[in-house]
Amino acid sequence: MALTQERKREIIEQFKVHENDTGSPEVQIAILTEQINNLNEHLRVHKKDHHSRRGLLKMVGKRRNLLAYLRNKDVARYRELIEKLGLRR
């Protein structure tokens, strides 16, 4: 299921770095994580949906690149974000 505008707004409110922030790496990564989790649930039910699986892999790659960027730019923000999102167990 696609992300609703309301849910997206909640994520932006939770992870924004400053007022009117929609494009910071933290917000982008949080939105991608939510989309990835939703798509994972879809793929558990629809195992043969290879088209969506490819989209999932693209999202994971994009999130990975954004995480690498944030880690190189500011390690403290990176660590705080992965703690909040529960990534890298």
UniProtKB/Swiss-Prot annotation:
- Kindly indicate whether the keyword Cell membrane belongs to this entry: no
Q: Which residues form the signal peptide?
A: none
What Gene Ontology biological process does one annotation of this record name? translation
Write one Gene Ontology MF term. structural constituent of ribosome
User: Which GO CC terms are listed, alphabetically?
Assistant: cytosolic small ribosomal subunit
Q: Which InterPro entries match?
A: Ribosomal_uS15, Ribosomal_uS15_bac-type, uS15_NS1_RNA-bd_sf
Pfam families registered for this protein in UniProt? Ribosomal_S15
Q: Which UniProt keywords apply?
A: Ribonucleoprotein, Ribosomal protein, RNA-binding, rRNA-binding
Q: Which domain of life is it from?
A: Bacteria
Among SUPFAM superfamilies, the record links this protein to: S15/NS1 RNA-binding domain
Q: Which family does it belong to?
A: Belongs to the universal ribosomal protein uS15 family.
State the protein's purpose: One of the primary rRNA binding proteins, it binds directly to 16S rRNA where it helps nucleate assembly of the platform of the 30S subunit by binding and bridging several RNA helices of the 16S rRNA. Forms an intersubunit bridge (bridge B4) with the 23S rRNA of the 50S subunit in the ribosome.
Q: How does it assemble?
A: Part of the 30S ribosomal subunit. Forms a bridge to the 50S subunit in the 70S ribosome, contacting the 23S rRNA.
Q: What is this protein called?
A: Small ribosomal subunit protein uS15
Organism encoding this protein: Geobacillus thermodenitrificans (strain NG80-2)
Lineage summary: Bacteria, Bacillati, Bacillota, Bacilli, Bacillales
- Quick one: which gene encodes this? rpsO
